[in-house]
Amino acid sequence: MSPTQRSLALLRRQGALAAVVERWNSYAKVRQDLWRFGDILAVTAEGIVIIQACGTGDQARRLEKIKSEIVWPKARQWLKAGGKIQVWGWAIRGAQGKRKRSTLTITEVVEG
């Protein structure tokens, strides 16, 4: 199960309205995020949030991408309009030979 699939499943279990907003560009053969920083758009009880879903090992790199001079103006505009941005990092953890569990680390993107 991919990080995006895990995130969607969790959001829906929590009662959020959630949809994948990244798309496949068949010409370039790459996935393109919404505004270069969003995989999932969710409406939750706390408000609207764009989620970048990844493995925990990629969280720092995704945060750097969002804060880059190319992406940050769009992300900042989203934040100023009242939206939230979160990077959800998933890991599969557990001792060898034991049952593995998915763990989630959520990092909130804030201005500054």
Model segments located where?
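Catalytic phosphate/metal-binding cores of nucleic-acid and nucleotide-processing enzymes, i.e., regions
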Residues: 1-112
